[in-house]
Amino acid sequence: MFEIGINLTSSQFDKDRLQVVERARTAGLSGMLITGTSAQESVEAQKMADEHPDFCWSTAGVHPHQASHWNAQVEAGIRELAVLPNVVAIGECGLDFNRNFSPADRQEAAFTAQLALAKELQLPVFLHCRDAGERFATLLKPWLSDLPGGVVHCFTGTRQELELYLSLGLSIGITGWVCDERRGLELRDMLPLIPADRLMLETDAPYLLPRDMENKPKNRRNEPAFLPHIVKQVALWRGEDPQWLADITDDNARKLFALSARR
């Protein structure tokens, strides 16, 4: 199984980052994608990926929350990172109109610039969208024919948004959000709508610890070693074999990010 979304640069992992990676290996993961969400965190993510060759890779990009910081210098830094062999996607990029930590116009400018960069470098995009589905799709659609692909990371949207993203040829990333009986039931019901070859799985650790997991850690921190629980639950709700789902979602990630086949 492949973890497409781990925020390994988070300070929550400062005391045991190496052990977190080793526990992921022990849990049966074949690889992980470390998320870059700002210029500095993209640098750190790439360095961390370097420490675990053939197991960790990274993205390079600027999250919509950080879009106000996008400028020519940041773009140059992301471009410099993105040509490195273990940086396999542009992002996390997109729109977030839920909190608007950056003004909408700055978010749109940073998103469009990163789509242009992905086209230039022929890299897939690692996408974020919250409460902005229609505008997100409008900005993204003209670029898709010139991109290798993209995944909507940590999808928590509506059925209408899911159908829209699938119609655009995007892959869908599902997290432990779906394990939350308070807010994940609608998403749970939508799981069978996602074609198996478009589904990817992720923890988004250290966030989104699955609520239905037994023996949860006292610190409430999520980590990639808990991905098997998400695989098991998603397989249950889709009516599929967990090992089959683990394998096909692994293959999907490796295909999108142009990685070698799992061993």
Curated annotation (Swiss-Prot):
Lineage per the UniProt record: Bacteria, Pseudomonadati, Pseudomonadota, Gammaproteobacteria, Enterobacterales
GO cellular component: cytoplasm
Entry protein name: 3'-5' ssDNA/RNA exonuclease TatD
InterPro entries: DNase_TatD-rel_CS, Exonuc_TatD, Metal_Hydrolase, TatD-like, TatD-type_Hydrolase
Compartments where located: Cytoplasm
UniProt similarity note: Belongs to the metallo-dependent hydrolases superfamily. TatD-type hydrolase family. TatD subfamily.
Biological function: 3'-5' exonuclease that prefers single-stranded DNA and RNA. May play a role in the H(2)O(2)-induced DNA damage repair.
EC supergroup of this enzyme: hydrolase
Primary subcellular site in the record, as a coarse category: cytoplasm
Cofactor: Mg(2+)
Enzyme Commission identifier(s): 3.1.11.-, 3.1.13.-
Subunit: Monomer.
Keyword Transferase: no
Keywords (A to Z) from UniProt: Cytoplasm, Exonuclease, Hydrolase, Magnesium, Metal-binding, Nuclease
Positions of a divalent metal cation binding: E92, H128, H153
Annotated PANTHER family: DEOXYRIBONUCLEASE TATDN1, TATD FAMILY DEOXYRIBONUCLEASE
Molecular function (Gene Ontology), one example: magnesium ion binding
Pfam families in alphabetical order: TatD_DNase
SUPFAM superfamilies: Metallo-dependent hydrolases (SSF51556)
